[in-house]
Amino acid sequence: MKPSLIIVTFIVVFMAISCVAADDEQETWIEKRGDCLPHLKRCKENNDCCSKKCKRRGTNPEKRCR
């Protein structure tokens, strides 16, 4: 009975670690994709933009790409 309990515990721990690793991988992929969305391309904090043409829009201090 105890060996089967150890095996089940090992499987559950392995699955939990796999799920956490998959979430980290997905976040890394999203970061690599970039900060710019296709429909609303935002400038980065250092004013570097996907289209390299940043301009202020309206009274909002946040800059956006055009």
From Swiss-Prot:
Expressed by the venom gland. It comes from Opistophthalmus carinatus (African yellow leg scorpion). The keyword Acetylation does not apply. Residues 1-22 form the signal peptide. Pfam families: Toxin_27. The keyword Disulfide bond applies. Residues 55-57 are annotated as: Essential for stimulation of [3H]ryanodine binding to RYR1. Belongs to the scorpion calcin family. Residues 23-31 form a propeptide. It is found in: Secreted. GO terms for cellular component: extracellular region. The lineage of its organism: Eukaryota, Metazoa, Ecdysozoa, Arthropoda, Chelicerata. This toxin stabilizes ryanodine receptor 1 (RyR1) opening in a long-lasting subconductance state (35% of the full conductance state). Furthermore, it triggers calcium release from sarcoplasmic vesicles (2 nM are enough to induce a sharp release, and 67% of the total calcium is released after toxin (100 nM) addition) probably by acting as a cell-penetrating peptide (CPP). In addition, it has been shown to dose-dependently stimulate ryanodine binding to RyR1 (EC(50)=0.3 nM). Disulfide bonds join 36-50, 43-54, 49-65. GO terms for molecular function: calcium channel inhibitor activity; toxin activity. It comes from the Eukaryota. This is Opicalcin-1. The record marks 64, 66 as: Essential for stimulation of [3H]ryanodine binding to RYR1. Its main location: secreted.
